[in-house]
Design a protein with these regions (language model features):
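Short membrane-interfacial helix/loop motifs at transmembrane-helix boundaries
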Residues: 1-7, 167
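Membrane-water interface segments at the C-terminal ends of transmembrane alpha-helices
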Residues: 8-113, 148-155, 195-203
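C-terminal transmembrane helix and the adjacent membrane-cytosol boundary/short C-terminal tail
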Residues: 37-43, 125, 189-217
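Helix-capping/transition residues at the boundaries of transmembrane alpha-helices
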Residues: 63, 80, 123-125, 152-155, ...
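Non-cytoplasmic
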Residues: 78, 149-198, 208
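Residue-level recognition of membrane-helix boundary sites in multi-pass small-molecule transporters
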Residues: 90-91, 119, 130-132, 143-144, ...
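Short helix-to-coil transition segments within interhelical loops
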Residues: 112-142, 182
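Transmembrane alpha-helices
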Residues: 130-161
Length: 217
């Protein structure tokens, strides 16, 4: 494998990491709060608001139901408005983030719903406000599983970023399609697959270790 190809793979890996990291950060900033809101506004919870809960739930379900490749194409005008372009790694971060937010929100919602409601009632009996319950009870109790959720999200975003290469998103997916598929260079196709597998394994190992460490605390 020539030095040019190695440099190409390094650039593609860095582009994939950029798309994944940016999208993960944005998804955490918006998806985790959305997941919390979906829980606390549900019927019988600390900030019950059934109407808001149903609206947010419908939006989340609608977004999650659209396959990623279709979502990328459908929001090209919005991507161009936000990123100034519809191709490249920066542009790919927009649909990746939009796909990631509802995905993480549902995972976080499930994690928080698994918390024993007796813990919440105990905090309420001691006079804790809804905000205090969220920050000091719900999030700490659900933290290990939220870390697992973020790990699952990152693994999905790595695969989504590879799909983004199909329509000019850059990264390893773009390299695999342009060189491995269109030019029949099997060595490059295999190399991109190996790199993607290594990235996923590393993310899973780190996420599992972090979750176990937080669980012990």
């Amino acid at each position: 494998m020539s030095e040019q190809i190695i440099n190409l793979l390094i650039t593609g890996t860095l582009d994939t990491l950029q798309m994944t990291i940016v999208s993960t950060i944005m998804a955490m900033l918006l998806g985790i709060p959305l997941g919390v809101i979906l829980v606390v506004t549900s019927k019988g919870h600390i900030l019950e608001n059934v109407a808001l809960n149903k609206v947010l739930g419908a939006i989340v379900n609608a977004t999650r139901s659209v396959p990623f490749i279709i979502l990328m194409v459908a929001i090209i005008p919005f991507t161009r408005m936000v990123a100034g372009t519809s191709i490249g790694t920066t542009a790919a971060c927009v649909p990746l983030t939009i796909a990631a937010i509802p995905f993480l929100a549902r995972l976080v919602e499930t994690s928080i719903k698994d918390i024993n409601f007796g813990v919440i009632e105990a905090a309420q009996s001691m006079g804790a406000s809804p905000l205090q319950i969220i920050w000091k009870v719900l999030l700490p109790e659900a933290l290990p599983t939220i870390i697992d959720n973020v790990t699952v999200l990152i693994v999905n975003l790595i695969s989504y970023s590879a799909m983004a290469g199909a329509i000019g998103g850059g990264g390893l997916g773009d390299i695999a399609i342009r060189y491995g598929y269109q030019r029949f260079q099997a060595d490059i196709m295999i190399a991109t697959i190996i790199i993607l597998v290594i990235l996923v394994q590393l993310v899973q190992m780190i996420g599992d270790a972090w979750s176990k460490a937080m669980n012990k605390k």
